[in-house]
From Swiss-Prot:
Belongs to the complex I subunit 3 family. NDH-1 is composed of 14 different subunits. Subunits NuoA, H, J, K, L, M, N constitute the membrane sector of the complex. It is found in: Cell inner membrane. It is a multi-pass membrane protein. The chain crosses the membrane at residues 9-29, 68-88, 96-116. NDH-1 shuttles electrons from NADH, via FMN and iron-sulfur (Fe-S) centers, to quinones in the respiratory chain. The immediate electron acceptor for the enzyme in this species is believed to be ubiquinone. Couples the redox reaction to proton translocation (for every two electrons transferred, four hydrogen ions are translocated across the cytoplasmic membrane), and thus conserves the redox energy in a proton gradient. This is NADH-quinone oxidoreductase subunit A. InterPro entries: NAD(P)H_OxRDtase_bac/plastid, NADH_UbQ/plastoQ_OxRdtase_su3, NDAH_ubi_oxred_su3_sf. It comes from Anaeromyxobacter sp. (strain Fw109-5).
Length: 128
């Protein structure tokens, strides 16, 4: 029987190797890489075009609202995956049964009500 420390040891070794390799590559690039700064190298590169306006622009609040809505529905998807796996009985697990089905139905209904609300408020309308 493996102890918890023995179980996680390979993961810790892989993590240390990855961090060590990244540190070595960054150090080698810093030591061996050429340093010839110039004005051309210092200008921002935007698809081969010269920048025509400053990078600091104000965005409409709608972008942030849509980003928040995306995060909410992305989190919903994260909650739906384990629920879908655990809903039915399998491999000795009894399953969630009707209680799990009803609770997830309430959860999804709440999110759908929120979606209908923001839709009616015009948050998703980009016409103006």
């Amino acid at each position: 029987m493996l102890t918890p420390l023995q179980t996680y040891f390979p993961i810790a070794v892989a993590l240390l190797v990855a961090v060590g390799l990244a540190a070595v590559m960054l150090a080698l690039a810093n030591v061996l890489g050429p340093r010839r700064p110039s004005e051309v190298k210092s200008t921002p590169f935007e698809c081969g075009s010269l920048p025509v306006s400053p990078a600091r622009e104000r965005f409409s609040v709608k972008f942030y609202v849509v980003a928040l809505l995306f995060i909410v529905f992305d989190i919903e998807a994260i909650f739906l995956y384990p629920w879908a796996v655990l809903l039915l009985p399998s491999d000795g697990y009894p399953g969630l049964g009707w209680a799990g089905y009803i609770s997830m139905g309430i959860f999804v209904a709440t999110l759908v009500a929120g979606l209908v609300y923001v839709w009616k408020k015009g948050v998703l309308d980009w016409a103006d």
